[in-house]
A protein has these predicted regions:
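Short, positively charged patches
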Residues: 1-140, 318-319
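Glycine-biased, small-residue-rich flexible motifs in mid-sequence functional cores and linkers
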Residues: 1-5, 92-321
Length: 321
């Protein structure tokens, strides 16, 4: 039976409907499928009965059908609102789906996006990430790194968080405004509507990213608030979407290492700046970041560099899209 991607999105909101079921259904999705409630019920009913057998959901058919109708109607309303806000969606079976994201079996089953989705495949992508509280030296180094990447036409990928993420996006946006080179992609752990973007202080930056030829990307429908688990997944996708990963600065724990773990799993090269402050007399915060850099190098095989020129030399042998 041909299935519409809208049906899969609606089914994903039903408690107890598993990823493996949805993953199988994605392959059967077709743009030619008619979007209607009858087709949705025919598609999801077999899984509904399995849920009851597992003790998930009610054995009352009337209650079960009300749940399906609610999920279907609510999803279609949200998708209509998405279109009004120029937020689009695709399934992982689409030819437009970013090819790098398919590198792991746990890739998002569908994506919501605002902006230019093509840059994920037509440009080299560099994940520039790090702590929410970078030092002045780290921010200075990061701006130089991002200017370099933008100059050579990289798409700078980050997560719109405060600190290193925000600096990566802002530097890319400013460079694009001044030169027309480079761009940036923000992967979010929430819906792409203005009311859901986290942190809300960066909602305006999100609009600037789109206006400058960039992209906002999420696996969550509008109206979805950020949650800790979503942030962990977001960290992984940043690396998975990229050709290289650059953790500007980090402590010994945090989301940066989720990204580095995924990079190591996929043999994605990673590079970390060795900052001058790491040679300074000990200070608790600097010592923590020094240890974070050491962990990235020793455990995750990050290659350290002191200048952009060194990074350039490291990238010359390969790392093409």
């Amino acid at each position: 039976m041909a299935i519409a991607i809208e049906h899969v999105i609606a089914a994903s909101s039903i408690k107890g409907v598993g990823r493996q079921f949805l993953l199988r259904c994605i392959d059967d999705c077709s743009d030619a499928s008619e979007i209607n409630y009858e087709n949705f019920v025919a598609f999801v009913a077999p899984e509904k009965h399995k849920r009851i057998c597992r003790g998930v959901g009610s054995c009352n058919p009337e209650i079960e059908m009300k749940e399906l109708k609610k999920a279907y109607d609510h999803t279609l309303k949200l998708l209509e609102r998405s279109a009004d806000e120029k937020i689009f969606y695709i399934g992982s079976n689409s030819s437009k789906y970013p090819r790098r994201l398919r590198r792991c079996k746990d890739h998002p089953l569908f994506l919501f996006y605002r902006g230019n989705l093509e840059i994920c495949d037509t440009m080299r992508c560099a994940a520039v990430i790090g702590t929410r509280q970078p030092s002045a030296d780290a921010l200075k180094a990061e701006k130089k790194i991002c200017d370099y990447l933008a100059e050579y036409g990289w798409n700078i990928v980050s997560g719109l968080a405060f600190g290193c993420d925000e600096t990566a996006h802002r530097t890319a946006v400013e460079y694009w405004k001044n030169t027309g080179k480079g761009t940036t992609t923000a992967i979010l752990a929430d819906g792409l509507d203005a009311g859901s973007i986290y942190p809300k202080e960066n909602a305006e930056l999100a609009d600037e990213i789109v206006d400058c030829g960039g992209l906002l990307l999420s696996e969550y429908i509008i109206g979805t608030s950020c949650r800790p688990y979503y942030l962990t997944e977001r960290d992984k996708w940043q690396a998975q979407l990229s050709d290289i990963v650059i953790p500007v600065q980090t402590g010994v724990a945090g989301g940066t290492f989720h990204a580095l773990t995924r990079a190591a799993e996929l043999d994605i090269p990673s590079f970390i700046p060795y900052l001058r402050e790491y040679d300074s007399p000990d200070c608790e915060q600097i010592d923590l970041c020094r240890k974070g850099m050491k962990k990235a190098v020793e455990k995750y095989k990050c290659r350290s560099f002191r200048t952009v020129l060194e990074l350039d030399r490291m990238l010359k042998p390969g790392c093409s899209a």
